[in-house]
Amino acid sequence: LRAAKCDLPLVADIHFLPSAAMEAAKHVEKVRINPGNYADKKKFAVKEYSDSDYEAELERLHEAFTPIVLRCKELGRAMRIGTNHGSLSDRIMNRYGDTPLGMVESALEFIRIAESHNYYDICLSMKASNPKVMIEAYRLAVSRMLASDMHYPLHLGVTEAGDGEDARIKSTIGIGTLLNDGIGDTIRVSLTEDPVYEIPVAQALAKKATQLWESHEAIDPQADEQNKDDIDPYSYTRNLTRTIELNSEFKLGGNQTPKVILKTQHPIHQYETIIQDVCKTQLNAKDCLLYTSDAADDRDS
């Protein structure tokens, strides 16, 4: 690549072998470390860690991770600490479970070790194949970093997205939601296709985000804490509301299934036609609230 006069920075993605990371750091601009398998093993073992046991494990982790930190610092290399939801270590799984919190804590352990050596050329990623888990993990990571006065860049991505339209939608949900939050500094759209097809999707997402960011003033995430609402953006819990009865058959709010409200010109007894027109497919109308536009106007009044 260098002989071909390609001067783009290269990233070595390392799993399992610290020795490979040590060698890669000599040749590339950035080394990616997976906290789940760099120094810990994945044997799906169930173990109850006492606080002293856990501290001993962190000391072992410190010894294993320090050499690559010092190598990157010496050579002026950057590092991505990239947590993957599918490869959390047994130690993290036993303490935090298979959760976004476990993903974040796994990365923060490595960051603290790096910072103990005054090494800060770090970016983070919190990838998962489930966009819901991925979004929650990144938001939680930002919150935890702000609380610790950390301001590391974030690399966004949805792992194992697949191919075709579904994969593009899946990646857009995960990456696009976070970009809309103002979160993300680099992005990767992972498709099980020729990698060249990943680029247009990523470019479209980046362009949309840039347009959005340029059209709004920058937001200080720590400013005006008192104006926050009661919704926790770092976990998926339903907002509590009271139940409203529209009539004897239909209730809204509380623990009721979310209802679908639509405007239609068809008589209400033609509900199958209404559903097909709107959804272009046959659906079960059991949990849908359907009424004519006239009825909607009456109830709105």
Predicted regions and their residues:
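N-terminal amphipathic alpha-helix/helix-capping segment at the start of soluble metabolic enzymes
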Residues: 223-269
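Catalytic alpha/beta core domains of metabolic enzymes, predominantly
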Residues: 52-61, 93-232, 238
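Structural preference for beta-strand elements that scaffold enzyme active sites
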Residues: 7-11, 30-32, 76-80, 121-125, ...
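Conserved small/polar residues in nucleotide/adenosyl-binding loops
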Residues: 291-298
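Small-residue-rich
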Residues: 253, 262-269, 274-287
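Alpha/beta enzyme core
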Residues: 3-8, 16-79, 83-122, 129-147, ...
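Active-site beta-loop-alpha junctions enriched in small/polar residues
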Residues: 15-17, 36-38, 82-88, 127-131, ...
